[in-house]
């Protein structure tokens, strides 16, 4: 599974209503922009959830 797909799944697990867009070529340089008043989720929390997938 690609890191992008893992990231998307992790974000949806942490906040099923999250709206975001991201840019980057790897997890290390990804920039996540939270849209539509979504409460931001820390990259550390997202990474921890990604590691479970």
Question: Can you annotate each of these PLM segments?
Answer:
Residues 1-53:
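Interaction-interface detector
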